[in-house]
Amino acid sequence: MISNAAISKVLRQIAYLIELEETKDNHEDNKNKVNTVFKIRAYRRTADVIENLSSNVEKIYNKWKLKGLTEIPSVGKAIALKIEEYITTGNIEYFGELKKRTPINVEEFYHLEGIGIGPRSVKALHDRLRIKNLAELEKAAAEGKIHSVPGFSYKKEESILRKIQSLKKDRGRYLLGDIYPLVKQIEVCLSNIKDVKKAIAVGSFRRMKETVGDIDYLVLSDAPEIVMDYFASMPEVDEVIGKGPSKTFVKLNNGMDADLLVVPKESFGSALQYFTGSKEHGVALRKIAISKGLHLNEWGIYDSNNNKMVAGSKEEDVYNILGLEWIPPEMRENNGEIELAKKERTGDGNKLKLPDLIDYNSLKGDLQVHSNDTDGMLSIQDIASAAKEKFELEYIAITDHTKSLALAHGLDEGRLLDQVNKISELNDILKNHFKYNNNNNKNKKDSSSSNSFRILSGAEVNILKDGSLDISNNVLDKLDVVGAAIHSNFSQPVEVQTNRLIKAAQNPNVDIIFHPTGRIINKREGYPVNIEKLINDAKDTGTVLEVDAHYNRLDLKDEYIRMAVQNGVKLVIDSDAHHSMHFAFLVFGIGQARRGWAKQSNILNTFSVEKMLNSLK
């Protein structure tokens, strides 16, 4: 079965190739240029939608054919036909024709867009230096040839080298959000086998790392042969690499390697700990075991004197016999969690404690949501309805982009105030709707304020080059929630960039700094920021820092979250939703917050709407 990520990737490459061709044809008339721009946007928008779609596109096609594809948001008939062709044949003729017309390896180059190397830049490099692939680009950059091309600087040359090294390092690793639905789907299918008692995806996936190399499934069953046969024949499996009595290796349809191991009941807990990792965490546990006269491996904990198993069936028992509290998987990186988990008291008589991490079901609201007033895909009413009905949130803030972000059709002061009035009217409609429902609810005990829902007015205000904002303070003062973010001038020095953020944070109307470092995982490193200085200023000014839960951002990084928590800086976890399906990304933000040791009390949008608003500046 073809993954959504594979379809999205092809559509992005088609858009890239169209733009590459457009840069060659300087004689194209204005009408055709406009059509080409819209065509490029259509392919990219469709790629975004499909990449974030919770349902598998091939399954939609198998059930509803072309009609099902055209009912996916933003998918027009022309692109739907291309998707149909890809699903049914594995190829797109138009894509092949585009590739034949250029010597440039688009599959390699389109990863560089995050550092500002788009089709126009790639064409310039090819025209001047005949560069056709990443290997040739790396060689030219290492030899100092890139900065000789008009439009390229020494700084850009260095940036290219860093990006290529990063791509090499991350080669074969997948974004957590790209593979999460597939991994969970397989996990559920395995769990539903009659002879399976437990099935868990372990490794870095269980630890909610932002990228994952491969997938390991651990299964508790007394019928390993049945499990092996089932796993090897799943439609999600592309190729069986190896199959034994209790372990099978496969390649999934998305190109990812996956292993499945069946273990007996007496060893399941020990295997769960061992294969969850991290490697460093496991090494530290084995050292503790040795110090206690024990031997720890994936099959259990044994007394070193007589080799008798003393624990292994439950993961909690493995930790307990080592004198430790059970440690949440997200914390298992050997960064101090083991010291906190020790049951004995410290020298001063105090007992260190593991933090009570934020729960995966604890978010009550989402404070970065976009509507089709700018670059979102749904109306305010539609995305609010989905937030309540499908994701059971109690409030959202509509934080559309503002005027200096022309690409997103950002709001000026007038349109922003119009939106505030629209939100007020929608809240009145919602209030009457819930009042009516409560009056008609036979079970009065269930007709509490939990049925209410509130839309907050807000904005994602653009931080300009000098740190000022692109919306006046007298308008910002009328909003419920103000987030500020950098969307341009990424290459300024670290001192300038940090001061830019700090100046925005010091504005009394700015409640939250959105995606504080601006990174796009595997695409853009983000702008340089003195994060320690920003965190200290956030503490002094009472400014909240955001954990952007979109899986290609996860900004803040986990180590920065931990730093913020240690300094008493409040955080929010937001989906950065541009469509209702994006609320599903909140799970990745929570996972990231847990990796940063955040408690529920550290995250403001675990609070009720009134308590959250009162906790802002």
Please describe what each predicted stretch is.
Residues 176, 372-373:
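Short acidic-aromatic active-site loops that bind/stabilize oxyanions
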Residues 33-50, 118, 446-472, 479-483:
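Extended, compositionally biased low-complexity polar/Lys-Gly-rich tracts
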Residues 199-201, 365-369, 460:
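Two-metal-ion RNase H-like nuclease active-site motif
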Residues 208-292, 298-371, 380-394, 403, ...:
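Charged catalytic cores and adjacent phosphate/nucleic-acid-binding surfaces used
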Residues 5-8, 15, 23, 37-247, ...:
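Accessory alpha-helical DNA-binding modules that contact the DNA backbone or grooves
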